[in-house]
A protein has these predicted regions:
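Bergerat-fold GHKL ATPase/HATPase_c domain
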Residues: 1-37
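Hydrophobic alpha-helical segments and their boundary regions
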Residues: 27, 31-35, 39, 67-69, ...
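Conserved beta-strand-loop-beta-strand hairpin that lines the nucleotide-binding pocket
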Residues: 1-5, 47-133
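Conserved ATP-binding N-box helix of the HATPase_c
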Residues: 30-55
């Protein structure tokens, strides 16, 4: 498969099924449930925590993908994410909504947050499968 790009913008909502279907179109079937979980967490965070579910505020997703890698950049119009300084804490930590950030780190190979632009970049690579002789 050659590299593909897609940009989506949608009003803040928790109805994400159509958006997720478009964003997962190039992901291999065996990875779809896991990546869907991660993308759903990220999109819910952007719409709910970033944009306060304000339908006048948009969530924008830039997608790039190749044969064995996928990258999603999610932007919201909110004020930022103060708890994002603690991205590596686990779900047992006491701060609210930290579970979603923990899930992102379990699902994606790379998670980068840009506070100044309210932008989250998620990268997933297809793990090489060792073949038996």
């Amino acid at each position: 498969m050659r590299n593909r790009q897609l940009t989506l913008s949608f009003p803040s909502t928790l109805y994400l099924s159509p958006v997720l279907e478009l964003l997962l179109a190039d992901v291999p079937a065996q990875l779809v449930p896991l990546v869907r979980l991660g993308l759903q967490e990220a999109l819910v965070n952007a719409a709910k925590h970033g944009n306060n579910l304000d339908p006048a505020k948009a969530v924008r997703v830039h997608y790039r993908g190749g044969a064995d890698w996928w990258c999603w950049v999610i932007e919201d119009q909110g004020a930022g994410c103060p708890e994002c300084t603690c991205l590596h804490q686990g779900p047992e930590d006491s701060w609210e909504s930290g579970r979603g950030l923990y899930i992102l780190h379990q699902v994606f190979d790379q998670v980068e947050w840009c506070q100044q632009r309210q932008r989250l970049q998620l990268t997933k690579r297809l793990a090489e499968v060792d073949s038996c002789p």
